[in-house]
Each structure stands twice: as C-alpha cells, then as structure tokens.
Regions:
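Conserved CoA-thioester-binding segment of acyl-CoA-metabolizing enzymes
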Residues: 1-57, 92
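Terminal peptide-recognition signature
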Residues: 17, 21, 36, 54, ...
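Short loop-to-helix capping motifs
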Residues: 21-22, 46, 76, 203, ...
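Glycine- (often His-adjacent) and acidic-residue-rich active-site loop
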Residues: 56-93, 109, 137-139, 222
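Crotonase-fold acyl-CoA enzyme core
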Residues: 92-208, 231, 235, 239-240, ...
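Short C-terminal tail/terminal secondary-structure segment
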Residues: 219, 255-258
C-alpha cells in the first residue's frame, strides 16, 4: 500500500507510524484514516514487529478530524454514515491490532485525535500537552467513540465532565486521571517514547497478544465469563513456548529470551 498521509518505519521490533499532515495539524482526513487502517492491518501480520507507536508530525499529535472535508461529506445522511463508518473501522483496526499500540502525544490531541489516542493500548504525552474532546464547544455530540471509550478509561463522572464541558487537560493531569499512562518533560519526549516502546517490545509477543485480547474481551463481559475466557486462553497452548522459557529462566536465575 502506498502512503501519502502517513509515514511507516520499522526498527528494532517497533513500527513507527507518523501522521504526516503537519500543514493542517495532522487533521484526520478520510484518506489518512484509510491509510492508517491499511498500515495497522499490514503490521498486524508482520512477525518482526511487536509494538506500534503512533505519533504526529510537526507541532502536535493532531487537531481532530478534517472538518473541511467532513463538512462536505455530512451534507446528507449517506455521506455522514460513510465518514463515520470509515472512522470506526480504523479505530477498531487500531484497537484490535495484535501488537501493542502506543500513542505518543505532543502539542495537543483534540476531539477525533483524542479518540484515536483512546483506541490505542497505551499512551505517553508531554506534561504540557493539551488533551481533550472539544465537540461540545461547537454544538456537536461525539460520534467517533469518545462517549464510550473515555468512561471506560477514566470513569463515568470524569468522562462526563470532560465531554460535557469541552475542556482540555494537560498531559500531566491526563496521567493523573488515567487518560494517558505517562507524562514526561517535552525536551525528553523522543527518548522517553523510545524507552517506553522498547520496554514492551522486549516482552514475549504471544502472551502480550493474549493479555491484550483478554482485557478487551473482558471489558464487554461479566466477571465470571471473563475469568472463564482467561482460563480457556491460558490453557490453550498458544503461549506455551514463552511460558516454558520464562519458567526455565526463573528457576535458573537468568533473563528469559523471547
């Protein structure tokens, strides 16, 4: 697949996807979202990759959807549905990718760009980043998953506060409330992101994939069903190689090699 709106690079078990529309603050056009979905699907089948990092070129992670394009598309219901279906397919491709997906946020991640961040497994941001869903400020209700993913991440009351007010929070505050995993100094951002990604890339891929799937499945099931799924998955044999290596390393007091 040829990419015009994103850049894909692979190195040391990590795939780096850069949203590359800096001239419009990485606004998420239909073309960019289609390319991102294609990249996630391709990377999902690449055994050399264990971690994906999604970041933005230029001043920010992203200012949200491409409103100029969206305004043209939503003039009728068919266009609006096509836009949102493409959007949701892409976010599900990110969320369901068998790799660990990390959002690296600098500058700001607003509205649709925040929805992309929330579809990732993990997120790291600069302390001074501005992060928020601003649909309410323009008389809009979220239609890109914020109303569903945000409360699952930070709880119902805080999610309602941010969604209904249209306020943004700093990266540091986003870390405190659980919207991102880690907030770091801006002048160490690149190094911190690389170290964060490398930590997860060093882990065994089969159990990592299984844990991701179990957590995602479990969020949609009652506790008893979710624990049963965990039991069945853990005894299915798919992670046996990593389990054997890990146990041997523990007994022999050495570092496991995955």
């Amino acid at each position: 697949m040829v990419f015009e709106n994103i850049i894909v690079e692979k190195k040391d078990r990590i795939a780096w996807i850069t949203l590359n529309r800096p001239q419009v603050l990485n606004a998420l056009s239909q073309e960019l979202m289609t390319e991102l979905r294609g990249a996630m699907e391709e990377i999902g089948g690449d055994d050399s990759v264990r971690v994906v990092v999604i970041r933005g070129a230029g001043r920010c992670f992203g200012a949200g959807g491409d409103l100029k394009q969206a305004r043209e598309m939503v003039s009728d219901l068919r266009g609006a549905r096509a836009l949102l279906e493409n959007w949701h397919r892409t976010l599900f491709a990110v969320e369901r990718c068998p790799k660990i997906v990390i959002a690296a946020v600098h500058g700001f991640a607003l509205a649709g760009s925040l929805e992309l961040v929330m579809a990732c497994d993990l997120a790291i941001a600069t302390e001074d980043a501005r992060i928020g869903d601003q649909h309410m400020n323009y008389g809009l209700a979220s239609a890109g998953s914020a109303s569903q993913r945000m409360p699952r991440l930070i709880g119902i009351r805080k999610a309602k506060e941010l969604l209904l007010s249209g306020d943004w929070v700093s990266g540091k505050e986003a870390e405190r409330i659980g919207l991102v995993n880690k907030a770091v100094l801006a002048d160490r951002f690149d190094e911190e992101v690389s170290e964060f990604a490398a930590k997860f890339a060093s882990k065994a891929p089969a159990p990592a994939r299984l844990i991701k799937e179990l957590v995602n499945w479990g969020m949609q099931a009652d506790l008893n069903t979710a624990i049963t799924l965990e039991l069945l998955a853990a005894t299915g044999g798919g992670t046996m190689g990593a389990t054997t290596e890990g146990m041997a390393a523990f007994v022999e007091k050495k570092k496991p090699e995955f």
